[in-house]
Amino acid sequence: MTIQDDMVGKHPIENDFWKWLQHEDTESSDLKRHRYLEVDSSNRDEAIKSVAAWLIKYHLSEGKKRVIRKKQEILEKHDFAEYAQSLHVFPKSDKTQKGNLGEIFLSEYLSQTSGVQILVYKLHYNPNIDQSMKGDDVLLVNPDKVLLGESKFRSTPNKRAVEEASELMKDKLTLPMSLGFIADRLFEQGKDELGEVIFDLQFKMSSIEIDIKNIGFLLSTKKVRSIVENNLSSPNSDFIFISLGMDDPAAFLKSVFDYAESNLLEGSYET
């Protein structure tokens, strides 16, 4: 077992990730803990389909799905497509698309590796879809473990991007800010018992030992591996950096949002 396995869990090898996502746990040191992920170019289309499905899941709430499903039953195909397009489910802003893609990918990956479920999809509560939401980029939590992530997207990787994805967490253990937000959403859903557990974690984090891990994430080209290896330095022993490399990340970004939008307009929005 690698240090990376111990911190965030083993890379998944028997599900959709295995088809198109390769991984390498690079050699660790006191100042560097790095897992490199790479989209397999030969399975890029599978990656686009998988990630597009995540975009729909993270942007489209169950309530909105019910309304859309009802409209789909009564509208002609062309009229339904016009209706679905008018809903503005996905951001048009390039900056927001990049931010959302990174956060969604990291959330899905960490949930797969750690087994910690995503309790609340925060983008369901975004009042302005073209602006990023404030608060923690990525937060997965259960009574025993907290995974807090900072995500960045760069078309070209560089030292500054690594620093930006690390700066909030690299020097000392960072605690989440959004536990109250998650608890409130659970209370609204009638999940009072779970909501109380999450709400109480704010106190317990300062008084008892809970496994908290900080994660920096950078999505970029395949050069990101060497950029992170050469520039990552963190004395925070609970900090790990995950990088994702692929051919032409800007084109990938456009493809996944276009595919998600197309599926929505065609009525294929169930995930």
Curated annotation (Swiss-Prot):
It comes from Bacillus cereus. InterPro entries: AbpA_HamA_C. Signal peptide: none annotated. GO terms for biological process: defense response to virus. It comes from the Bacteria. Component of antiviral defense system Hachiman, composed of HamA and HamB. Expression of Hachiman in B.subtilis (strain BEST7003) confers resistance to phages phi105, phi29, phi3T, rho14, SBSphiJ, SpBeta and SPR. It holds the Pfam family HamA. Disruption phenotype: When this gene is missing the Hachiman system does not confer SpBeta resistance in B.subtilis. Keywords: Antiviral defense. This is Hachiman protein HamA.
